[in-house]
């Protein structure tokens, strides 16, 4: 038998409560950490993964919807700009037409047409005296003269009117004198000759123009 056990016979009884206390201290769950230790533990558990600055990728459906919305906004913007441009052009055209219709005696329209008209007139203009006084139209009918009536024909007309005799109950004028009839006949004859000359000249110019074109 061990001498230590002989000397201390109560040692087994004392050791048993100590072992029970040690087992009781080791057996239960560890106690909760203090308030100062909790932040340190939280920081130690953080992982060096991606930070919060990196955006989380959106799902494909949301990406398509956002793309459609941006596309529709851009298309609407372009459509609005195109509509405004068309509106400005239409208003400008309407104002121009209104200005042309409101111009007195169509001065504005004649001013635009006059260069082409002058060009065509210069092309078919004749240098003879009769064509300068009577400008022929394209239809072959001579136009009106720009000058005043010939004084001789006016005088003959006045003489013929002065020779008329007015009587009650008779509406037939008296005969014209022979001196007034001769200048009138010669004037009519000259006028017919001038018309014939202008017609021939116009036909010649028209034929020449058709051959050139």
UniProtKB/Swiss-Prot annotation:
Residues 8-37 have a biased composition (Polar residues). GO terms for cellular component: membrane; nuclear envelope. It is a single-pass membrane protein. The modification N-acetylmethionine is found at residue 1. Keywords: Acetylation, Membrane, Phosphoprotein, Transmembrane, Transmembrane helix. GO terms for molecular function: methylated histone binding. This is Protein FAM156A/FAM156B. It comes from Homo sapiens.
